[in-house]
Design a protein with these regions (language model features):
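Short acidic/histidine- and often glycine-rich active-site loop of Leloir-type glycosyltransferases
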Residues: 203-216, 220-221
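Conserved acidic donor-binding segment of nucleotide-sugar-dependent glycosyltransferases
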Residues: 215-216, 220-227, 235-242
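Conserved donor-binding/catalytic core segment of Leloir-type glycosyltransferases
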Residues: 49, 87-105, 111-114, 127
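Nucleotide-activated donor-binding/catalytic signature segment of Leloir-type glycosyltransferases, i.e.
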Residues: 137-160
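Short hydrophobic beta-strand element within catalytic cores of glycosyltransferases
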Residues: 191, 196, 200-203
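Acidic donor-binding loop of glycosyltransferase active sites
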Residues: 167-182, 199
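Carbohydrate-associated surface elements
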Residues: 54, 75
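Short alpha-helical donor nucleotide-sugar binding micro-motif in glycosyltransferases
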Residues: 156-157, 164-169
C-alpha cells in the first residue's frame, strides 16, 4: 500500500507486486483496519500474489480484479533435504510437532486427542517443539489431563537437535485451526519440510493445507478442531504397515 502511494508521488518507479500469506488476509483486526487500503491497492498495484487458491478467491471477493491475481506457491529447496527410509511406526508411536505455540497451530486440540489416545490404551509419546504465547496454556492442559508421561514440551531446540528428533518421529502432526480472531495459516512450511524428508504428516482441512496434502495420498487430513477425528487418525496410523505407508510417502 505504501509502495503504491510512493509510486504515485514519483518517489519510486516500477511495477508493484504484493504477496498475501496468512494473517494479512484472515485476521479480522487486520481486515477491519486495512480493507480500505487494500481496495486502493487493488486499483493501484500491478499484481497480487496470494500463496493459495483459497486466498486468491478471497481477494476476488474483496474486489480485486481477477486479471491481477496470480497464485504464487511457497516451497522448500529439496536439495537441502535427504529423504529417510520408510519408517513403520514403532511402540510407542512417536508423534512430533514443530511450531510456534499459538492458537492457530491447534496444539490444544492435539493435546485433547492425546487424552483420548491414552484413554484408549494407545502406546504413544508426543513431543511439541517450539515457544510462543500459548506455552503456559498448553502446559496447563497437559497437567490437567495427566499426560506428563506422554506429552513433552522441550521448548526451543537448535536445528541439529530438531533434526535428530524428527528422525526419531513416526509422524509429524500439525492440527491447524482458525483462531478466535480469524487468524489462519497460509500453507505451513513445516509441513513441506516434513514431507520433503519423508515423514508422514497428519494435519487438518484448514486454509490452504488441502492444496498441499491430498488426504490418504500424500498424508492425512481431518476436520479442524475435531480431537476425536484426530485421535482416530493417529490410532489408525499406529497400526499401519509398510505396504500401506509407502504410497503415502
Amino acid at each position: 500500500v505504501t509502495a503504491a502511494k510512493l509510486r504515485e508521488l514519483g518517489v519510486i518507479d516500477g511495477k508493484i507486486a504484493t504477496i498475501f500469506h496468512g494473517i494479512d488476509i484472515s485476521s479480522r483486526e487486520v481486515l477491519n483496519h486495512y480493507t480500505p487500503e487494500y481496495q486502493q491497492l487493488f486499483q493501484r498495484g500491478d499484481m497480487m500474489l496470494p500463496i493459495s487458491d483459497l486466498w486468491a478467491g478471497r481477494l476476488k471477493k474483496m474486489g480485486c480484479p481477477g486479471e491481477k491475481i496470480t497464485v504464487s506457491r511457497m516451497g522448500v529447496d529439496l536439495a537441502r533435504f535427504t529423504r529417510r527410509p520408510v519408517k513403520v511406526p514403532g511402540k510407542p508411536l512417536q508423534i512430533i510437532s514443530v511450531a510456534r505455540l499459538t492458537e492457530k497451530k491447534g496444539l490444544h486440540v492435539a493435546i485433547e486427542a492425546c487424552r483420548q489416545l491414552k484413554a484408549r490404551g494407545v502406546d504413544f509419546r508426543y513431543r511439541i517443539l517450539g515457544i510462543g504465547p500459548w506455552e503456559r496454556r498448553l502446559r496447563t492442559l497437559i497437567e490437567q489431563y495427566e499426560l506428563e508421561t506422554h506429552v513433552e514440551m522441550p521448548g526451543f531446540k537448535p536445528s541439529h537437535e530438531v533434526k535428530a528428533m524428527l528422525d526419531e518421529a513416526d509422524v509429524f502432526l500439525l492440527p491447524s485451526v482458525t483462531g478466535a480472531d480469524g487468524d489462519m495459516e497460509g500453507i505451513p512450511v513445516a509441513l513441506m519440510e516434513a514431507m520433503a524428508v519423508g515423514i508422514p504428516v497428519v494435519s487438518t482441512l484448514h486454509s490452504g493445507i488441502p492444496e498441499l496434502i491430498k488426504s490418504d495420498h500424500s498424508g492425512w487430513l481431518v476436520p479442524e478442531n475435531n480431537a476425536m477425528a484426530l485421535a482416530d487418525r493417529l490410532a489408525a496410523f499406529s497400526d499401519i504397515d509398510q505396504q500401506a505407508l509407502e504410497p503415502v510417502l
